[in-house]
Amino acid sequence: MKPLKGCPVAKDVRVAIVGSCFNSPIADRLVAGAQETFFDFGGDPSSLTIVRVPGAFEIPCAIKKLLSTSGQFHAVVACGVLIQGETSHYEHIADSVAAGVSRLSLDFCLPITFSVITAPNMEAAWERAGIKGPNLGASGMKTALEMASLFSLIGKE
């Protein structure tokens, strides 16, 4: 038996990127990285929807609205930036956003990747946005495309 494995291909794949605006210089890099990766893998501009929300907390709600009203996407990439502060606010938001995105992925049986940076400081966040390492938005898009491809194979074998 041959194992099923998806390939990162964007041709004929409809994807949404939901990105937060808070910490916009870094968040913008994540969204741009996801967008560039979509095009690098053959995506058509008309098959990509980009939605910007005020902060990371709003990401799950925006994804749910997109999926509930259109149902036209093969995958979603969630992009945002959370920087740890001196209060517990960071932990509450990070946990809530991660749980919300995960729950939506399961509820809609759809690949939704978590490209939300959770970092102890701005320097670490910049590193995860592609300054000293991979851009988390780009890697999230590649994963989303691989999973969309895999989902198209499941049940056809």
Swiss-Prot record:
Entry binding sites for (2S)-2-hydroxy-3-oxobutyl phosphate: 86-87, 128
Pathway: Cofactor biosynthesis; riboflavin biosynthesis; riboflavin from 2-hydroxy-3-oxobutyl phosphate and 5-amino-6-(D-ribitylamino)uracil: step 1/2
Record-listed 5-amino-6-(D-ribitylamino)uracil binding positions: 22, 56-58, 81-83, 114
Reactions listed under catalytic activity: (2S)-2-hydroxy-3-oxobutyl phosphate + 5-amino-6-(D-ribitylamino)uracil = 6,7-dimethyl-8-(1-D-ribityl)lumazine + phosphate + 2 H2O + H(+)
Enzyme class of the recorded protein, top EC level: transferase
Catalytic residues of the enzyme: 89
EC number(s) per entry: 2.5.1.78
One Gene Ontology molecular-function label: 6,7-dimethyl-8-ribityllumazine synthase activity
Statement: the UniProt record of this protein carries the keyword Transferase: yes
Annotated InterPro entries: LS, LS/RS, LS/RS_sf
GO cellular component: cytoplasm; cytosol; riboflavin synthase complex
SUPFAM superfamilies associated with the record: Lumazine synthase
CDD domains membership: Lumazine_synthase-I
Keywords: Riboflavin biosynthesis, Transferase
Short name of any one Pfam family annotated for the protein: DMRL_synthase
Biological role stated in the UniProt entry: Catalyzes the formation of 6,7-dimethyl-8-ribityllumazine by condensation of 5-amino-6-(D-ribitylamino)uracil with 3,4-dihydroxy-2-butanone 4-phosphate. This is the penultimate step in the biosynthesis of riboflavin.
UniProt similarity note: Belongs to the DMRL synthase family.
Name the record gives this protein: 6,7-dimethyl-8-ribityllumazine synthase
Organism: Chlamydia trachomatis serovar D (strain ATCC VR-885 / DSM 19411 / UW-3/Cx)
